[in-house]
Amino acid sequence: MNRYTTMKQLGDGTYGSVLMGKSNESGELVAIKRMKRKFYSWDECMNLREVKSLKKLNHANVIKLKEVIRENDHLYFVFEYMKENLYQLMKDRNKLFPESVIRNIMYQILQGLAFIHKHGFFHRDMKPENLLCMGPELVKIADFGLARELRSQPPYTDYVSTRWYRAPEVLLRSSVYSSPIDVWAVGSIMAELYTFRPLFPGTSEVDEIFKICQVLGTPKKSDWPEGYQLASSMNFRFPQCIPINLKTLIPNASSEAIQLMTEMLNWDPKKRPTASQALKHPYFQVGQVLGSSAHHLDTKQTLHKQLQPLEPKPSSSERDPKPLPNILDQPAGQPQPKQGHQPLQTIQPPQNTVTHPPPKQQGHQKPPQTMFPSIIKTIPVNSVSTLGHKGARRRWGQTVFKSGDSCDDIEDDLGASHSKKPSMEACKEKKKESPFRFPDSGLPVSNHFKGENRNLHASVSLKSDPNLSTASTAKQYYLKQSRYLPGVNPKNVSLVAGGKDINSHSWNNQLFPKSLGSMGADLSFKRSNAAGNLGSYTTYNQTGYMPSFLKKEVGSAGQRIQLAPLGASASDYTWSTKTGRGQFSGRTYNPTAKNLNIVNRTQPVPSVHGRTDWVAKYGGHR
C-alpha cells in the first residue's frame, strides 16, 4: 500500500470502507476499498465473490478492479476512481433529466448488466448508489460484494439489495431467484431517473409489497402462480389494489419508456426481458449513438469539453465524450420519431405550440447522422455577433435584438429546447402585435426587465437603430420623451415638483432605485456608463427565492400605472399608489389599457399638494 497515498474517505459500507487515493507512480486517482474483516491467507481472499466476479469482468460499463493487496491481514481492492454515484448525480440537480440523458444512462447500465449476466454472474444489489458516474455521459456498475454466479447452487440469502429496488420474489423469500432481480432493480432505477423519487419507497418488506401493489395492481394467480405459492407459504395475502398507469406517475416519460419500464417491472420474473432483450427495445432505437465509446474518459477531458463553446444541437445525441453536462440543461430535444412529447418541466411556461415543433425538429435532425452536426442552416446570413459567448443555451443569430427583450428569453431560463423556440421573424411579429406585453406570461413586467438568467456582460443600447423593429423604435421614442422611466418611485416627487428637468439617463440616482426585476428573469440593473445605455444585466437571487409581491395578480405591486388616453393620445400616465406597499418601486402594466376603448378614468386627476397636473401642463396631446 506504500505505492498509494490515501487522500480522504469516500464512503463506508457493510463490508468495507472506501478511500480516495493517488498512485505515487502515475498520479492516477484510485478508489481503495478496505475490507473490515481480516484475511489470513491468499486462498481466503481469492474465494471472495467480489474478487472472483471482477477478475473475469472487463467492460466499459463495469468498474475495473486494478489490483488486490493483502497487507497485515487486511485486504484492499484498488478500483478505478469515479467522481460520483448516480444517487449523488440526481440529488445535486435542481431540475429533471431530459429523456435523451436518461436513455443514454439506461443504455450504459443495461450494457454492463448484459455483460455481467453473459459471464454467468448476477449483481443482487443494483441501486443508484452502486452505479458510479463521471457525469451522466459515463456510467459503470460497481460493488460486486453480493454478486453470485448464475450456476451456483441455491438457496440464496433472502436479504439482498436495498429494499426499494428489491424484486417481489426476493421480498416473498424465494430461494431460487436469479438474474431477473437485477432487471427489476434497473426498471425501478429508470423510473427514479425520470422523477428523482423512488417508485416503490417501502418502509418495510410488507410495506414494499404494498407499494408495488399500489402501482402495478394486485397480481392475478394466473399471472404469477409461483408468487401466490410463496405468499401462502409465509401466510401472506396480497393487498387488493387497482393498477395505476405509469404514465400518470411519470408524465415526462415517452410511451416507449413507459412500455420498457412496464415490461421490466413484471410480477413474474420469467416474463421480464433479459438485459440483452431490453437493449433491443424500441426505446433505444432512435438513430442516435448511445453508450460510452470513450471509457478512458478522465476529469480533465470532461472539464475541457464543458468549457468549449457550445453550439445548438437540436438532436443532442449522447456521443461520448460529446454529451457532457451541457445536455442536462436542455430538455429532451432528442430525435424521437414516435413521439412528440416534452419531458415534465414543472416550471415551464405554456408554449404557443406543442404539436408543431417536432416536424421542425426532424428537419434539423437529418444532417446530424454524421459525427459533427452542421449548424450553418440555422445561422442568418446577416447576423453579426456583438455580444460574444453568453452560455450554453444562447441561440446564434439572435443578437440583433439590441434592446435585450427577445421574446424567447424566459424560455431560455426555464430550459426550453432550441428546436421549440420561435424564429426571429415570429418573434418580431409578436413584438409588433403587442409591444408593451410580456410574451407567454401574465406577469406585469417592463420590457427592459426581461432577460436570460445568465451573466450578460454587454450593454443594452437605447439609441435608435434602423435594423430594429417598429415596436422597438416606438418604445425608444417613448423613453426619450417620457419623464417617467422604468423603476421610478412616484413618491420621490421633489425634483418634479420643483420644476427641475430629470435627466432620462441618470440611472444611478436616488430617484431611480434599482429595480427588483421580473420573476422570470431574476435580474437587477446596474449602471454601466452615463452615455445613455441601460446597464448590463447581472444575476441575483440564485436560490430561486421570489418576493411575495411579485406572485400576485396584475396591479398588486406597489404602484399601478393606468393608461388614460385623452383624445387620440395614449401617452399620458397617471399614478395611483396603494397604501402600505409604496416601498416597492417598479412599473406595472395594466392589461385593460391595451384596448383603448376601455378607459378606467375619463376625468384627469387634479393637482393636489404640489403634484403636477400633467394634463394641464401638456394639454393632453404630445
UniProtKB/Swiss-Prot annotation:
Family recorded in the similarity comment: Belongs to the protein kinase superfamily. CMGC Ser/Thr protein kinase family. CDC2/CDKX subfamily.
Group of enzyme by EC: transferase
Assembly and binders: Interacts with AR and CDK20. Found in a complex containing MAK, AR and NCOA3. Interacts with FZR1 (via WD repeats). Interacts with RP1.
Cofactor field: Mg(2+)
Compositional bias ranges of the Polar residues kind: 336-355
GO cellular-component term (any): nucleoplasm
Catalytic activity of the protein: L-seryl-[protein] + ATP = O-phospho-L-seryl-[protein] + ADP + H(+); L-threonyl-[protein] + ATP = O-phospho-L-threonyl-[protein] + ADP + H(+)
Modified-residue entries (Phosphothreonine), positions: T157
Localisation: Nucleus; Cytoplasm, Cytoskeleton, Microtubule organizing center, Centrosome; Cytoplasm, Cytoskeleton, Spindle; Midbody
Annotated ATP binding sites: L10, G11, D12, G13, T14, Y15, G16, S17, V18, K33
GO molecular function, one term: protein serine kinase activity
Cell division found in the keyword field: no
Protein name: Serine/threonine-protein kinase MAK
PROSITE patterns documented for this protein: PROTEIN_KINASE_ATP, PROTEIN_KINASE_DOM, PROTEIN_KINASE_ST
